[in-house]
Amino acid sequence: MAISTQRDSRWAALALIVTAQFMVILDVAIVNVALPSIKSDLDFSPTNLQWVISAYAILFGGALLLGGRLADLLGRRRLFVTGLALFSAASLLCGVAWSEASLIGFRAVQGLGGALLVPAALSLLMTIFAEGRERNLALGIYAAASGSGAAAGVLLGGLLTSYLSWSWIFFINVPVGLAAIALTPLLLRESRADLPHRHFDLPGAASVTAGLMLLVYATTRAAGDGWGAPVTLALFGAAATLIAAFVVIELRSKSPLLPLRIFRLRTLTGANAAMAIVGAVAFSEFFVLSLYLQDVLRYSAVQSGLAFVAFALSVVVISNVAQAVVGRFGVRPTLTLGLLASAASVAWLARLPIDGHYFWDLFPAFMLGGAGMGLSFVPITIGGLAGVERSDAGVASGLINTSRQIGGALGIAAVSAIAATATRNYADTHAAVTATSAPALDHGFQTALYVLTGLLLAGAAIALTLVKPAPAQAAEVAPADADAVALDEAA
């Protein structure tokens, strides 16, 4: 194999990969509770503040497929280190940002670093562990890091912002990134796809990266300009044109960036669709609940962060149990159960009153929601790599992460618009209520959470429809080929 298979070094390598993944996912959410401080210190306008999140999401989500294929062609360890270096440098620059434009620009560079790092990390994991029980365990740990990263980000963001400053939500990445770069040559060997060519699909890369970025940008703009505004429609039209051009290019290319044949794998297709929904819900839920806790319940940044500890712990614990559940029952029932549990949790949260109590109103829903996410991320990650050939390991890793990030970016933009519209409508129809009052804000948040509940129910239907049923024992069958990258389609 391309990576050392000694038992101790494999798990040390996994720890390195998981740490890098956790750091990148953490940064998606860590800024949420720091936004009020950032707004005050850098004199952000209300309309530009969302770009602290959106700039990261646009570059991260838009360039993941590019990062995945570059890892296959140029070397997974090389892209892993490059991504770490870019992410760490951008984090340092974010911490010393002096204006709106500088912080937004450095966040975009940070997102690009994440787009190079994440698919390389997951494809390295696939080459370290052969399919079967050990890989499922490794993927369970990886998924736990991914699933808990957002919740941990809210907690850590609150602590750092309250006791140090918002700059430290970025500075904290620098020593972690430098340590990871130093350890990489010791724990990871170079790995690249065994392809008959080294051609790079530049037209495909340019069209899909621009198309996905424009799609996220259009959705973000729609929140302020309106969904029917000419500029919004023009942006969506341009994004659709670029993505359609990408499909045509890939169908004709001899060395496609994204081999469209992989979508013939039902489990992979269903897993990516479910991941887009889970990403939309996870990003939006933390965004909405962070605002609910601070604007309606008047929690401090630290209190808001601590409120999510139950959710984070539930994700970590259940993610590590979920790999055994997948091994016993298969991807489809585990994923469906996770999505339904998440839907029940969000529906519970949609009933939150303006004087909600943490232990009676929030804690049970957070525990159930964390369990649902834990039961979802593991089968999605396993299913998203099901049947993938070794030569496509990087691009499959990029695809599953693209589904998550694009879903999250689109979700948070759409849900923000829905919540804002519902809040304004409530204020307009209640004479004594303003759009910034707790009752109006609470109504907007409730409306957004009901929409997310519907999305999760749709995800459960997709899992039942697209994900291939499997014999219970399939996920634990030992591999015939130790170098195989693909998980058995029956996993």
Whereabouts are the PLM-identified features?
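C-terminal membrane-cytosol helix-exit motif in multi-pass small-molecule transporters
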Residues: L122, V174-A193, T209-R221, A238-S253, ...
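Transmembrane-helix bundle of Major Facilitator Superfamily
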Residues: M1-L186, N320-A322, F329, L335, ...
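A residue-level signal for alpha-helical anchor/packing sites in multi-pass solute transporters
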Residues: L124, I128, L159, L183, ...
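Intrinsic disorder in cytosolic terminal tails and internal cytosolic loops
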Residues: M1-S9, D194-H197, T436, L466-A491
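Flexible interhelical linker loops that connect adjacent transmembrane helices
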Residues: A2-S4, I181-T209, L251-R266, G327-R328, ...
